[in-house]
Amino acid sequence: MSRIEAVFFDCDGTLVDSEVICSRAYVTMFQEFGITLDPEEVFKRFKGVKLYEIIDIVSLEHGVTLAKTEAEHVYRAEVARLFDSELEAIEGAGALLSAITAPMCVVSNGPNNKMQHSMGKLICCTTSRINCSAATIFSAGSQTRR
C-alpha cells in the first residue's frame, strides 16, 4: 500500500456546515432584486454551483438582467453576516483533522476571503491543527480564467 502524501478537503459541506447558509444568502440576494425563491429549491438546485452561474440561471428564468457585481456584493455581505452568527463545524471535522498526520489543505470554488472566514470559524470551533495560512487554502474562484 502506498503512503498518503497529502489530504485535500473541500470546505463547504465537508468541514463546515455552510451549504444551507449559502442557500439562504442566495434567497436574500434575489429578494433584494424583487425575485422570490424557495430556500429548499435553491439548496437542491444550486448546491455546488458557482455564484455567477446561479445569477445567470435565475435571471434567465425570471426575464431580468441583474448586475452581477452588485448582486455578488449583496450575497457576500449576507454570507459573512450569517457565517458570523450561524456557521458551525461539521460534527467530527475537528477530530478528523486532529487525527490526520499527513499534510492537509483546503480547496474550494469560493473566493479566498470566504474560505478564510470558514476556516477561522472551524478553528474556533475545534482544536484542529490545520494551518489556515494562504498556503493551505486553494481557491478556484481566485484563479483567472483562460
Model-found features: residue ranges?
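Metal-dependent phosphoesterase signature
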Residues: 58-95
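Active-site neighborhood of HAD-like aspartate-dependent phosphohydrolases
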Residues: 1-44
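Substrate-recognition "cap/lid" segment bordering the active-site pocket of phosphatases
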Residues: 105, 111-146
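Short beta->alpha linker loops
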Residues: 21, 46, 50, 74, ...
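Conserved H-loop
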Residues: 36, 65, 125-129
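Short, acidic loop-to-helix structural element flanking the phosphoryl-transfer center
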Residues: 3, 81-106, 112-116
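Helix-loop "lid/cap" segments that line or gate small-molecule binding pockets
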Residues: 29-30, 50-65, 118
